[in-house]
């Protein structure tokens, strides 16, 4: 855990495997108005995909499939979605079929709090 000003930053676990078959549960105690999460996926050497999500409610969150931002060279596409706090991914090639990968996934939680 790192604390910078009024923000606690925490990486809880690094996940590895086929990103198309991994689901990550966001803890309810972190899903709170004002908190946020960064998700970083490295499906192949030389490319990373990243997204940030600001929680707009307490407890349970859902989000329709959205594109992630690419850094590096990768001809495939990456999307993420959240359903009842479960984050899932879709990594596909140009033919809209799941692309082969052995991904590393990091979820970084940002918990905001007021100084006392």
Predicted regions, residues:
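Terminal beta-strand-rich extracellular "head" domains
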Residues: 44-52, 56-76
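Extracellular jelly-roll beta-sandwich "head" domains, especially the C-terminal globular C1q domain
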Residues: 66-116
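Surface-exposed ligand/attachment interfaces on beta-rich extracellular proteins
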Residues: 11-34, 44-49
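Extracellular and analogous surface-interaction loops
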Residues: 25-32, 56, 109-112
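Beta-strand-rich, repetitive solenoid scaffolds
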Residues: 4-5, 52, 81
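Glycine-rich, low-complexity segments
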Residues: 1-23, 113-116
């Amino acid at each position: 855990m790192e604390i910078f000003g009024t923000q606690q930053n925490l990486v809880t676990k690094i996940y590895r495997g086929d990103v198309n078959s991994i689901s990550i549960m966001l803890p309810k105690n972190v899903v709170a108005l004002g908190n946020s999460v960064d998700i970083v996926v490295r499906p192949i050497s030389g490319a990373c995909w990243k997204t940030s999500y600001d929680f707009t409610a307490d407890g349970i969150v859902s989000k329709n499939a959205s594109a992630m931002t690419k850094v590096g060279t990768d001809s495939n596409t990456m999307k993420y979605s959240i359903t009842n706090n479960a984050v899932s991914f879709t990594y596909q090639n140009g033919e809209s079929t799941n692309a082969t990968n052995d991904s590393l996934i990091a979820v970084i939680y940002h918990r905001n709090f007021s100084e006392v």
